[in-house]
């Protein structure tokens, strides 16, 4: 019996020693209730972001006789060298060049319905077939020239299609008819 009493006393001593070295869970933390609240609630969303000084230098796109065709259509027309570089970029990324043309409206328009849909000018007629396997940018520009001869009053654009992801990755106007 004496041995059992000694061992239980040793266990009790160890447990008490471990409890004595433990730190209380919130020792040293202060309550936030003692800090004064000096922040006012600002529910005005106009103070979050502002372009105040820049408003005077912004301009509005003139909509009369200045139609927008693609994302960067406000830039000057691309020269033959710039077109060649764009097509080389398209081919370097592994995209398939496609040519499309539109004979009546080279811009988005809504003739049949007020809501966007198939007949709102976003879908153009494809020129021949996509140029699968094309590795030379001059071949694409030769097709643009051929399309110009066939339809001189049409808008012609070049599209880069990623056939792996099944998405159109790039699109730009290669030719606009006279007067546009």
Swiss-Prot record:
RuBisCO catalyzes two reactions: the carboxylation of D-ribulose 1,5-bisphosphate, the primary event in carbon dioxide fixation, as well as the oxidative fragmentation of the pentose substrate. Both reactions occur simultaneously and in competition at the same active site. Although the small subunit is not catalytic it is essential for maximal activity. SMART domains: RuBisCO_small. Its main location: plastid. Pfam families: RbcS, RuBisCO_small. Heterohexadecamer of 8 large and 8 small subunits. This is Ribulose bisphosphate carboxylase small subunit, chloroplastic 4. It is found in: Plastid, Chloroplast. Belongs to the RuBisCO small chain family. One of its GO terms (molecular function) is ribulose-bisphosphate carboxylase activity. CDD domains: RuBisCO_small. GO terms for biological process: photorespiration; reductive pentose-phosphate cycle. It comes from Solanum tuberosum.
